[in-house]
C-alpha cells in the first residue's frame, strides 16, 4: 500500500487576511511538508491587495513553485473548484489549472460539479459535466496530472452520485478526492464511502466537523468550506487512516481543511500522532 502524508490547504489562512506567500511560510513553520494552493481565473481585489491566499493563474506559475520550494514544501495538489456542469465558467479554468499544475509539478487538480444552472435538467447536466471532464482529461492525460473529483454539491453528495460523475468519462487521469467533512455533513457514512473509493483515491481532504456544526447542518447541506481542527470533531481519524492504508495502492496526502492557523497546527499534531 501507499504512504500517507499530512498536508495543509491554504484555506487555513483565509481568516488571517494574508497573501499566499504568508500562508506557505507559516505552514512550513508549523511543520507541514505538503501544501495545497488554491488558484483562481482572472483577477480579484483581495488577493491582488495581499489580503487573501488564492493565486491568479494569470500570474507566472513559478510564483507558486518558488514560494513552496523556498519554504521546503511539496505541492500535493492545486485546488481549482468550479461548476463542471457550466463549461463556459469552468472549461478553460480547469484546463489552465491542469497546465499550471504540470508546469510546477503538482500531481493533482481538485474540482467538483459545483452549483448547477437553474434551468437545466439532471440529464442535461450530465452531458455538460461529461463535456467539461472529457476536455479536461485530454489535457491531463498528456501531462500526467490527475483530476480529483470531490464530493461537494448536488450530485456528488452521495456515493452513487459521485460514482456517476466519475464514470462519465473513461480516463486514467480521473480519480477521487474524498472530503471527509463534506461526506459527513451530507448525511453519509464516511467510512463505507471511503472504502468504496479508496482504490481510486488520488488525494484526500482531511476535514473534521465539530459536534455543534454537525447538530446544526448534518443532512441539510452538501459541504462546507472548512472544518474544525482534526481531532476536535466527529471524524474517527484512526479509522480513516486504516482504511486508506489497507485499500489505497498509491501515496496519498491528507490535506487538512480548517479555518485558522491554530487549528492547522493542532490538526498536524493529531494526525502525525496517529500515523
Residue ranges and their predicted role:
Residues 12-14, 39-43, 81-84, 113-117, ...:
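Active-site-proximal loop/turn and secondary-structure-junction residues that shape catalytic pockets
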Residues 36-63, 116-120:
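Glycine-rich, proline-tolerant flexible connector loops at the mouths of alpha/beta enzymes
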Residues 255-265:
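A short, acidic, flexible beta-alpha connecting loop/helix-capping segment that sits on the rim
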Residues 22-28, 34, 61-70, 74, ...:
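Active-site acidic/histidine proton-transfer and metal-coordination neighborhood
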Residues 49-55, 123-124, 223-229:
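Short glycine-enriched, charge-decorated loop/helix-capping segments at active-site entrances
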Residues 32, 106, 201, 249-251:
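A structural motif
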Residues 264-275:
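C-terminal helical cap(s) of enzyme catalytic domains, especially alpha/beta-barrels
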Residues 2-10, 14, 18, 22-24, ...:
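Acidic/histidine-rich catalytic cores of soluble enzymes
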